[in-house]
């Protein structure tokens, strides 16, 4: 076969196959161009899921008439000169418009801010017509009709009109979060009109824009993030652990304002929440990374969806550290969705619709809501109604010991705060975040009262988190005990992996794993963590080598140790079915208030829910 040059049309169609996957890809490119042009209003109109019509209108700087033909030519751009590593615009390759024009019927109309009239060019299947004068307000309109008409095979891979319209909406929302000062609107015959009014600049405006996309509930359950390390700044908002979702669709990441789906960023996000949410749940987060363009390569993916950091370990450490710090400092804060779910459950059961029944003799009256409850028949006498806090009478679990020896040494199980005064009244306790314990129901749930809410605590889940945090603190406070192997295990690795792993020998030794290089392509394992018991050493070393090669960290071993600690905590916690004394219940509440991450157990389930008095009044039809 003869080698020959491809035609310009075929070249553009090949490029379109890389850049333009679906109608949403077209909208992404056109909206980014509008943002680069300094637009403050961007309107998107679609029909037929974008396959029939796509139109983007903006009030940006516009394109001069003599540059319109260049705008639809390959590799013609105003955003890049000679430094491909200093990219500050969303678009820079000059491929979007010619690629779109090669597979559709494209019309480009523009009028610069200082021009008296507008001009337009048309591109049909790669063939240019114009420019010619046209009536137009200042700004630019790009209209795309019959997408993929020139490559009908691509239409077979399109989804339904509704699915494509939804994808377009998602793209506009994702871009819009990063630019709250721009007003976005979507309309068309295939959708319900949607608008995101401009909210301004700054963190407050960004949170308001995020609320337009994710709903007001996110703002009520969000923690602000703002950290910087070695010239890389991380800002944004993350949800508290109990505010999570069943998929990762509500995770947004931006690098220098560019929406990305980078596995390193989202991997770090998962790592930051690994201890506080269940494995099958996903945190809600909006993260903005700002750094020197020379420190990140955005030219590694045709659609610029992925990036490559010069120092991925720095970025991962910044994300994990900043989020963990924010979670630790958030204190006691339940998700607002928990109370709403409870109210919905009551409504679903018809609660409140039944005829009022006679009030039992021992029930509370409205006037008694903020007063001490009557003493039960057992364990609560007038002398113990307002006790001092005393330590929980709990022993370390059998799982903490092996052959009579403490695996982690003398790890103290969280105890109550014994500093509370004997004279401390329930009124003072009710001012605390989790309030004063009022009762224990079904020997598993603690009912507490604050000044304006009712709190229900799962005693096993709560104490499990307290014990787990104590064990983790013990792990980090001193080196982990190791057990020597009678015969060292030799693990064959690629030479580079072996060298990298040996370079982390000191860090691994703190976790009870003794390794040293054994020749150019092998690692000798002489000691393993005692608390892990029997293990697959070969698989562990290979997993660590892969992790160090990718992230330059050995967090996998730490995660394994934490998993064992979580199992110990589960078995070493106060069990369901155990009756607690009032002082023990109050002690548990105080320890929860002082422990980071106590809103969820080790498995990610909530340890407590809170019903505001206003919620209860709504439940009974008082609001």
Swiss-Prot record:
Keyword set includes DNA damage: yes
Region called Disordered, residue ranges: 353-389
CDD domains, per database record: HATPase_MutL-MLH-PMS-like, MutL_Trans
Polar residues biased stretches: 353-368
Molecular function as annotated in GO: ATP binding; ATP hydrolysis activity; ATP-dependent DNA damage sensor activity; mismatched DNA binding
Disulfide bonds: none
Gene Ontology terms: biological process: mismatch repair
InterPro entries xrefs: DNA_mismatch_repair_CS, DNA_mismatch_repair_MutL, DNA_mismatch_S5_2-like, HATPase_C_sf, MutL/Mlh/PMS, MutL/Mlh/Pms-like, MutL_C, MutL_C_dimsub
Leader sequence segment: none
Functional note: This protein is involved in the repair of mismatches in DNA. It is required for dam-dependent methyl-directed DNA mismatch repair. May act as a 'molecular matchmaker', a protein that promotes the formation of a stable complex between two or more DNA-binding proteins in an ATP-dependent manner without itself being part of a final effector complex.
The protein's name: DNA mismatch repair protein MutL
